[in-house]
A protein has these predicted regions:
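Phosphate- and other anionic-substrate recognition elements at nucleic-acid/protein interfaces
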Residues: 1-38
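Generic structural signal for well-ordered, non-transmembrane alpha-helical segments
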Residues: 13, 20-27, 47, 51-58, ...
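Helix-hairpin-helix/helix-loop-helix acidic hairpins
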Residues: 30-86, 94-98, 102, 110, ...
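Catalytic DNA-binding helix-loop module of base-excision-repair DNA glycosylases/AP lyases
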Residues: 72-73, 82-118, 127, 133-142, ...
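Post-HExxH zinc-binding segment in Zn-dependent metallohydrolases
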Residues: 124
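A basic, often C-terminal nucleic-acid-binding module that engages the phosphate backbone, implemented
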Residues: 127-129, 135, 139, 147-234, ...
Length: 334
């Protein structure tokens, strides 16, 4: 039998797909055990399932983290507070998973992709293998503009679930971007500083331009069945009757602080995706473009990727931080 050689293609997309699937199973198993524990019971099979898949999940995370260093944008996001290795490996894996084969001569193939056609296998509806020939286009190569990455991540206007229609974005990438936003909030780094400034700008804009008043978000939500207000933070159903709670609707002329917070956090996530797109493509020598405000609206100020670098990657041989604290190193006179 012919000995097969290891492929040079990164398996990060495949590993990410497997890890996120196992993560979902682990969460379901833990929730089930927690629920049974409240009723003073347990399930040995669920415990055994968790015991068997946790080592696989740990192995997947370690392998994903080892591959993330090969990403062309690693030099940048490894110096950003809140962009942890595990989270970034999943996010990058989802973007890499956007790559696909195109038929030779397909007009959708970007002009800068010069790869030779190669054979690949697909399965038909009956599970039979079909050998085809096509040109491979990487995920970041397909995302020709920053707005396309935003749209793919569900961070563009109108990218919401529609009843009876297929999603127009990658739900898992949107979830991972939301996790990253939460991580930035906790890290209190450059992106958190941007969030704070943009939040102040939004509050000033809605009060001076739109004439609205910014009010604290009410804790209570109304239950029609119980005919009362219920104080819950994230629940959708009444803890007493189980009925669905009403949404928190803003009265005319009022905008809740929670709404402003979500808008600012959303913009922070968009900024990261824009900068990641720019660094990744520029490092590969792919065409890049200036941000929309600069290119179309003639703005003069711009946030560069280097402006958001605020931590050490921990490696002494790093040509950027030399293993030193990034903030302290910037204050040194040399």
């Amino acid at each position: 039998m012919e000995e097969l050689k290891p492929t040079k293609k990164s398996p990060l997309a495949t590993l990410t797909n497997a890890e996120l699937a196992i993560e979902k199973i682990m969460v379901m198993a833990k929730v089930r055990l927690k629920h049974l524990e409240r009723h003073r019971t347990t399930c040995p099979d669920t415990k055994e399932l968790l015991h068997r898949i946790e080592p696989i999940d740990n192995w997947l995370v370690r392998r994903m983290e080892s591959y993330i260093e090969a990403n062309p944008a690693y030099w940048w996001f490894s110096h950003v507070k809140g962009a942890g290795r595990e989270l970034m490996s999943k996010l990058i894996g989802e973007i890499e998973g956007f790559g696909r084969y195109y038929d030779v001569g397909d007009p959708e193939i970007p002009p800068y992709v010069k790869r030779e056609p190669e054979e690949y296998i697909i399965l038909d509806e009956d599970g039979n293998e079909i050998v085809k020939k096509g040109i491979w286009v990487e995920g970041i190569e397909r995302l020709t503009t920053p707005s396309k990455l935003r749209a793919y991540a569900g961070k563009a206007p109108g990218r919401k679930p529609q009843k009876g229609a297929k999603l127009t974005y990658n739900a898992r990438l949107k979830m991972l971007t939301h996790r990253l936003e939460k991580s930035f909030m906790q890290a209190r780094g450059s992106f958190y500083t941007f969030y704070g400034g943009y939040k102040d700008y939004l509050e000033d804009r809605v009060t001076t331009k739109d004439g609205k008043k910014v009010m604290p978000t009410p804790k209570a939500r109304y239950c029609p069945q119980c005919d009362k207000e219920v104080e819950v933070k994230r629940a959708r159903y009444c803890p007493d009757c189980g009925g669905q709670l009403s949404q928190k609707t803003e009265p005319p002329g009022i905008i809740y602080k929670g709404h402003v917070h979500q808008m600012a956090q959303h913009r922070m996530g968009q900024l990261f995706l824009d900068l990641l797109w720019h660094v990744w493509r520029e490092s590969l020598g792919l065409p890049v473009r200036e941000p929309y405000p600069v290119e179309k609206q003639e703005h003069t100020s711009i946030i560069r990727p280097e402006d958001m670098m605020d931590k050490s990657c921990g490696k002494k041989d790093c040509p950027i931080c030399h293993g030193k604290d990034f903030e302290r190193r910037q204050n040194e006179s040399y």
